[in-house]
Amino acid sequence: DEARLSGHPVLPRMMTGHALNCRAMALRCAADVLHKPLADCRLIVLHLGGGGSARLFIGGKMVDGVRDDEWMFAPERMGGVSLQPLVAMCYSGAYTKQDIMDLIRGKGGLMAHLGTASAQEVEQRIADGDAHAKLVYDGMLYSCARAIGGLAAAADGRVDRIILTGGLAHSRYVTGYLTQKLSFIAPVEVMAGEFEL
């Protein structure tokens, strides 16, 4: 369907990443918070750990999503970047294919900007007055909020809840930032950790 189309037919969008935990959190929110079946809910779930993804559930089905190699970056993921500079890097002769793959997954995101993927370390640096750490961390969270805003548009603006899950949902800094950015769309529910079915 239209959610799987990209700008080129040989590169369809992939709907992978944290699907089990996102579905488990959607089911839990539907039952425990909204008191109705998932089939009757419109939910957006953001999973944020070392990587990240966001999923849109409508009618009990995962109908759209954003991976951490698309719009948003994460502690170890590069996220959405301008393609022309990336292609130039690939053909510069300075990087192997594995080097590029490592930059995308494992050495991207907070790791690339700050030399660590530890949210606790970054938050301590922010508390100690590191303005660059705050800029990068807030930039990562901004990219997550932007991705969720896109999924809200795909849901025609009708969303019952936005669920924050994954390891970073334990952080008050993270949940506070995202709640401030997203609560105009729908109430934000924090369901930290992972509970895969």
Predicted regions and their residues:
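Claisen-condensing/thiolase-fold acyl-transfer catalytic domains that form or cleave C-C bonds
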Residues: 144, 171-172
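Short beta-strand scaffold segments in enzyme catalytic cores
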Residues: 52-57
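Adenine-nucleotide phosphate-binding core of ATP-dependent small-molecule kinases
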Residues: 102, 106-157
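Short acidic-hydrophobic catalytic motif
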Residues: 60
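N-terminal Rossmann-like NAD(P) cofactor-binding subdomain of oxidoreductases
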Residues: 1
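Conserved phosphate-binding/catalytic loops in two-lobed NTP-binding clefts
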Residues: 172, 176-197
